[in-house]
Amino acid sequence: MERTFAMIKPDGVRRGLTPEILARIHNKGYRVVGLKQMMMPRETAEQHYGEHRERPFFGELVDFITGGPVVAIALEGENAIAGWRAMMGATNPANAAPGTIRADFATSTGENVTHGSDSPESAERELALFFGDGELLS
């Protein structure tokens, strides 16, 4: 079984999309092994999006992600990384396939409702960043 990190961003939480997104996760057969709603500390956001540090949008991205609660989710299942990314759809909702979370709910590339790890390495790093020892179900 593979694990991945998923997140409902502040725009999704603010718009009350958490129950719908969790239902979609359940309906796809993924197991939620960790879940927490939280205000993301700025330091955590800067670590999480560290690869974008030199990009012009970095400050705005950190401000957005720390500007409201997020839902951090640890998912487990067969091909969880690729499967969750397929469920999310393309980063730009205009390019997202019909029926994906972003096609259905995102309003822009910046406010695209969800995040998902893009590799086993980033999944491991992101899960460790958001969940401490003993916080994930075995």
UniProtKB/Swiss-Prot annotation:
Its cofactor is Mg(2+). Its main location: cytoplasm. GO terms for molecular function: ATP binding; metal ion binding; nucleoside diphosphate kinase activity. Keywords: ATP-binding, Cytoplasm, Kinase, Magnesium, Metal-binding, Nucleotide metabolism, Nucleotide-binding, Phosphoprotein, Transferase. The keyword Transcription does not apply. The active site is at residue 115. Coiled coil: none annotated. ATP binds at residues 9, 57, 85, 91, 102, 112. It catalyses: a 2'-deoxyribonucleoside 5'-diphosphate + ATP = a 2'-deoxyribonucleoside 5'-triphosphate + ADP; a ribonucleoside 5'-diphosphate + ATP = a ribonucleoside 5'-triphosphate + ADP. Its EC number is 2.7.4.6. InterPro entries: NDK-like_dom, NDK-like_dom_sf, Nucleoside_diP_kinase, Nucleoside_diP_kinase_AS. GO terms for biological process: CTP biosynthetic process; GTP biosynthetic process; UTP biosynthetic process. Belongs to the NDK family. Major role in the synthesis of nucleoside triphosphates other than ATP. The ATP gamma phosphate is transferred to the NDP beta phosphate via a ping-pong mechanism, using a phosphorylated active-site intermediate. This is Nucleoside diphosphate kinase. It comes from Deinococcus radiodurans (strain ATCC 13939 / DSM 20539 / JCM 16871 / CCUG 27074 / LMG 4051 / NBRC 15346 / NCIMB 9279 / VKM B-1422 / R1). The gene is ndk.
